[in-house]
Amino acid sequence: MYLTPSEKRINLSKVHPTDKLADQIFAYYKEGERDGKDEIIKNVPLKRIRK
């Protein structure tokens, strides 16, 4: 599924900011944004960090 940058920001905002995995996801997201890989966020297991 294709996500626009604003949709990805909404998804990332649901992640608790103090979670170390959240920082990791944000790093992957920024890396993907630099490389122009919009699909990179879908490979991150968001369910694992929801408590």
Curated annotation (Swiss-Prot):
The keyword RNA-binding is annotated on this UniProt entry: no
Keyword annotations of the record: Actin-binding, Cell projection, Cell shape, Cytoplasm, Developmental protein, Differentiation, Neurogenesis, Synapse, Synaptosome
Compartment annotation: Cytoplasm; Cytoplasm, Perinuclear region; Cell projection, Lamellipodium; Cell projection, Ruffle
GO cellular component terms listed in the entry, alphabetical order: lamellipodium; neuron projection; perinuclear region of cytoplasm; ruffle; synapse
Molecular-function GO term, any one: small GTPase binding
Biological-process GO terms, alphabetical: axon extension; lamellipodium assembly; regulation of cell shape; ruffle organization
Principal localisation: cytoplasm
Sequence similarity: Belongs to the CYFIP family.
Function, as annotated: Component of the CYFIP1-EIF4E-FMR1 complex which binds to the mRNA cap and mediates translational repression. In the CYFIP1-EIF4E-FMR1 complex this subunit is an adapter between EIF4E and FMR1. Promotes the translation repression activity of FMR1 in brain probably by mediating its association with EIF4E and mRNA. Regulates formation of membrane ruffles and lamellipodia. Plays a role in axon outgrowth. Binds to F-actin but not to RNA. Part of the WAVE complex that regulates actin filament reorganization via its interaction with the Arp2/3 complex.
Subunit relationships: Component of the WAVE1 complex composed of ABI2, CYFIP1 or CYFIP2, BRK1, NCKAP1 and WASF1/WAVE1. Within the complex, a heterodimer containing NCKAP1 and CYFIP1 interacts with a heterotrimer formed by WAVE1, ABI2 and BRK1. Component of the CYFIP1-EIF4E-FMR1 complex which is composed of CYFIP, EIF4E and FMR1. Interacts with FMR1 but does not bind to related proteins FXR1 or FXR2. Interaction with EIF4E stimulates FMR1 binding. Component of the WAVE2 complex composed of ABI1, CYFIP1/SRA1, NCKAP1/NAP1 (NCKAP1l/HEM1 in hematopoietic cells) and WASF2/WAVE2.
Record's protein name: Cytoplasmic FMR1-interacting protein 1
